[in-house]
C-alpha cells in the first residue's frame, strides 16, 4: 500500500498486487527483490517461469548467484549452457546488489559482469540506467561478488555502530545529543568527501594530528584497542557468510556456489 500511495500520481506507473504472472507478461524488465528465503518458492511457479522466458531478470537478492537462479528458472540449465540464445533460454539473469543507501539515492550498486558473450549489451545498459537513479552503479567480476556483498552491503551497518558509539561518547562529555549527532554526521560526510577527492586515509589522519595533541591521543587509544583488527575481522566474517549464502545453488566451487578464500574467517 505504501508504494501505491507513493506512485499514485504517476500516470505511467501501475501497481500490481497478487498477480505476478500478469505483471511479468506486461514487462520487458523484471526485478527480483524478494527475501532470499523466498527465491525458490517464487521461481518454482511454472507460470512465472514461462512469463520470464527471453526477458531480462535483474536480481537484487543477496547470496543467490546467477547460476543458482538460472537453474531454478529451468531444470534444463545444463542444456542451455551451450545454447545461450534468447528464444530458448528461460531468462537473461543479471545479478546486482544495491545497499540501504538507496533510500537517499547514494547506493553503491554492484552489477555483475555477465559471462556469456551473447548476453545482450543493452541489458547491461538498462541495469546501469536503473541503478544510476539510486546512486552509483559499478561493474564487478563474478568472483568478487561475495566480497562486494559485504564491502558494499554490510558496511553501512558498521558505520552506524561506529557513529552511534561516537555520539554516545560526545554526550558523555557534555554535548547535547542533537548537537553531537549534527557534528558527527557532518564530520563523517566531510571525511568521506575528502577521501573521494583522492586524499589517502593515512594522509587524512595525519592532517588532523599534531605532537602531543588531542587527536593523536585518541588515535593511540584506537590502535591500542586493536580497532583495525576488529574491523578487519568483522568485514572478513561478513564476506565469509556471504560466500556461505552463495552455496544455496550448489556446493562451493560448483556452478552457483562461491569459491572459498584463504582469508575467510572460518570454514562453513
Regions from the PLM with identified roles:
Residues 68-92, 108-147, 158-197, 241:
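Internal alpha-helical scaffold of NAD(P)-dependent oxidoreductase catalytic cores
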Residues 94, 145-150, 201-206:
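Short pre-catalytic strand/loop immediately N-terminal to key active-site residues, enriched for Gly-Thr
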